[in-house]
Structures are given as structure tokens and as C-alpha cells.
Amino acid sequence: MRYTKSEEAMKVAETLMPGGVNSPVRAFKSVDTPAIFMDHGKGSKIYDIDGNEYIDYVLSWGPLILGHRDPQVISHLHEAIDKGTSFGASTLLENKLAQLVIDRVPSIEKVRMVSSGTEATLDTLRLARGYTGRNKIVKFEGCYHGHSDSLLIKAGSGVATLGLPDSPGVPEGIAKNTITVPYNDLDALKIAFEKFGNDIAGVIVEPVAGNMGVVPPIEGFLQGLRDITTEYGALLIFDEVMTGFRVGYHCAQGYFGVTPDLTCLGKVIGGGLPVGAFGGKKEIMDHIAPLGNIYQAGTLSGNPLAMTSGYETLSQLTPETYEYFNMLGDILEDGLKRVFAKHNVPITVNRAGSMIGYFLNEGPVTNFEQANKSDLKLFAEMYREMAKEGVFLPPSQFEGTFLSTAHTKEDIEKTIQAFDTALSRIVK
């Protein structure tokens, strides 16, 4: 494939934006390849400005659960645009999406719309601290909860991709109130609560850690979080920005049968437009302004375009949607294991609903330390060869791949064949 136009565009972009991008992973640094500039997408396919076609497993980093340019979403967006893009006042569309979210997410009795997942987690932590009167938050190594200061500590995903353990610019005074323990390690969490329990406002966790390459919870982990937080009077917060409506019809909390106090949402809830949300029990949510004294606001929160895209996306998801994802996931997982075994290359495949992660090591992978043992050099080679075969994968070992309703069995079979061809060139 040729990337002449992308390379020229990147040279210009680097004079205009730091690193030439508006989000670090788009620079493709960890796979040592030129950044690809995209032009358009349709269904399960995405097309770059050089005219190359790819089967897309990035899906805008998760939001496009229906694939690119879903006809129903696009049609209703056109109708919404004709009425106006933003009003700075409430619309009926906010009620529609809020009711749908409340109906689908077990923990949510009231919800507040925002414009990004980072806003959702930031505001949720403020709410947890204000509601409990406590200062400290517990998070898990390798779990990414957006780029607010108190959460950008041992954060996995983008930070891990860049090889940075933490981000400079996070003040010590903020960092000291964030306690970090290994993911899937209840014993470590118990020790943290024994030491700081009276000042822990909440525990925030990705119920499936999608920002270390898709790492599901081990048996009993989420229920253990529920039990420990209840014992100490702390809030359990599920960051379902990635897992929300991807792991199951009732999100990860419905799939695993564990209900948190507060939930953060994003990505799929916006159907490709900038949306975040957080919600939970009425008694907690009613502490937010204007009912309570915990402040939160946003100029474009609940804007009609985002509400339209979100509602028209979620309204098309049914329990049968997730059966389809499981079927495609089974085919892809079996194919990956077969092809990698054929070439004597170790692989560990982790799955949760329409999220799939593969690690180039013997496994198992249940935490960030084990995820870090993946062969990153081989991953970069694999990425480059797969792009040549017309498969667009996340350019980072620490990001998961995503399925959409637009993907077909044919797409999956082509992808498996592409892995076989790529490995044939890499493994001599």
C-alpha cells in the first residue's frame, strides 16, 4: 500500500499541532509507521486519503458499534442539524436518551450528560468525594479513566504506549490522594482499605480493563469490590466508558451481575459524536447542582446532535446483537489461535462481548504486569503487515479491538487469512 498523501499531510500537521495529532496514539509511534490520514468510512470498512481500504477494528476507538455511517443514525442527524446544532437550553432529545440509559443500566436511577468520558470520570470523582466527605480514590494499575490529574497515575493505554509511568504536570498534592493497586488483586485492595479506609471516597474500576489490551475480571473480583466498598462506606464506581453497551445489553454490570453505586459512560452512548455521562442512585445524584451543592456544568452537555446520535445508536441494540458479537468473536478467536499455532508464535486472546484483545505472550494476562510481557516488537511488525493486508488494528498493544454489527463472517475470515499471510512474512 502507498501512503504518499498521508505522509505529506503529516508533515503539514506537525507544523500545526504537537506531534501532528490531537490525540497521541494517532501518531502511530509505538508501531513505528507513518500516521494514516482517513477520508471516509462505510459499514465495517474505512478508507484513507491515499484510497486504501481496510476492515476497521478500531471503530473510532469503540464508539461505532453499528459501523460507519449507519443509515438510521445519519438520517436522524440530518433532521437534527436542520433544526439547529446547539441551544444552551434543554431539549426533548435529552429526556429520550436519559430514559433509555436508565432503562438499560442497572445502577442508574438518574443520569447527567457531559461531552466526554474524561468529563464523566472527573465529575464522578468530585461527586464521590462531595457525597462521602472523604478525599482518597482507589484505582487499578493499567486502568485508564481519562486524562484528569487525579486519574493519570499508572494509567495504562496511551500512557503505557508512550512508555511513561505517569504524566509530568500532575501535582504531588493531587497524586497523594490517588491510591493505586494491581488489577484483579483483592488482597492488595484490602490492605489499602485497612490503612486508609476511613478516608477512601470510592473505588473506580474498568469492569473489563480495556486500556491494557482487554483484561476481564477474574472470578469474584467485581463482587469482592462491591463487598469491600460496602463494608467501609465507600462508593463503587464502574468506568463503563468503554464497556458500556459493548460487553452486554445491560453493560458490564448487567453481564457480571454486580451493581456499582455510580457509573461512567461514553463512546457507544454517543454513537460517534462527543458524549459522556455519569449516573447512579438518586440519593447520590441529587447532590449535584442545581439540587445539591456539588457543581458540574457544560456548554455543550446534552447537545441535540450528540443526543440524536446516541439515541439512534442505542435504540438499535438488542439482546440478539450480543449473540451476533459472540458468534463473530468465537470465529475470530479460534482463527487467531489456529494461525498463531501454525507459525509457532505464542498468543493469548482475551474477550468480553464485542471487545477482543490479543497479547503476544504465553499468558495468562489478568493484570498490567502480565500485559507488559507481550512482545511489543513483534506486535509492531504485525501491525505493519496487517495494514498491508487491508486490516486496520489499533496501533498499540494496550488497546483492544472492537466489533460492530456491520462486520460479517467474510470480514472475520479475511482477517484471519491476513494474520496468516502476515505471519508468513514475519516468521522465517
From Swiss-Prot:
InterPro entries, A to Z: 4pyrrol_synth_GluAld_NH2Trfase, Aminotrans_3, Aminotrans_3_PPA_site, PyrdxlP-dep_Trfase, PyrdxlP-dep_Trfase_major, PyrdxlP-dep_Trfase_small
Pathway involvement of the protein, from the record: Porphyrin-containing compound metabolism; protoporphyrin-IX biosynthesis; 5-aminolevulinate from L-glutamyl-tRNA(Glu): step 2/2
Annotated catalysed reactions: (S)-4-amino-5-oxopentanoate = 5-aminolevulinate
GO terms for cellular component: cytoplasm
Modified residues (N6-(pyridoxal phosphate)lysine): 267
Any Gene Ontology biological process: protoporphyrinogen IX biosynthetic process
Subcellular location: Cytoplasm
Keywords: Cytoplasm, Isomerase, Porphyrin biosynthesis, Pyridoxal phosphate
GO molecular function annotations of the record: glutamate-1-semialdehyde 2,1-aminomutase activity; pyridoxal phosphate binding; transaminase activity
Classification via CDD domains: OAT_like (cd00610)
Domain of life where this protein originates: Bacteria
Pfam hit, one: Aminotran_3
SUPFAM superfamilies: PLP-dependent transferases
Residue intervals passing through the bilayer: none
Cofactor(s), names only, from the UniProt record: pyridoxal 5'-phosphate
Record-listed E.C. numbers: 5.4.3.8
Subunit: Homodimer.
The family this protein is said to belong to: Belongs to the class-III pyridoxal-phosphate-dependent aminotransferase family. HemL subfamily.
PANTHER family, alphabetized: GLUTAMATE-1-SEMIALDEHYDE 2,1-AMINOMUTASE, GLUTAMATE-1-SEMIALDEHYDE 2,1-AMINOMUTASE 1, CHLOROPLASTIC-RELATED
Protein name in UniProt: Glutamate-1-semialdehyde 2,1-aminomutase 1
Protein source organism: Staphylococcus aureus (strain NCTC 8325 / PS 47)
Origin organism lineage: Bacteria, Bacillati, Bacillota, Bacilli, Bacillales
